[in-house]
């Protein structure tokens, strides 16, 4: 994941900051509790494609 991209992408729901989870290869929005997948190096920032984070994952 290109860290320069993290500086410009935002959560499509709340427009907030996304954090990269290297282990799961996802972009995380803690505010909306959503994890967006990264497929072939491309973030899939479509809400229906995101998975909901558990309360343990939000910490």
From Swiss-Prot:
Organism (species): Photobacterium profundum (strain SS9)
Transmembrane stretches, start-end: none
GO cellular component terms given for this protein: cytosol
The protein, known as: UPF0434 protein PBPRA2383
Pfam families in the record: Trm112p
Similarity comment: Belongs to the UPF0434 family.
InterPro entries named in the record: Trm112-like
Coiled coil (UniProt feature): none
Superkingdom classification of source: Bacteria
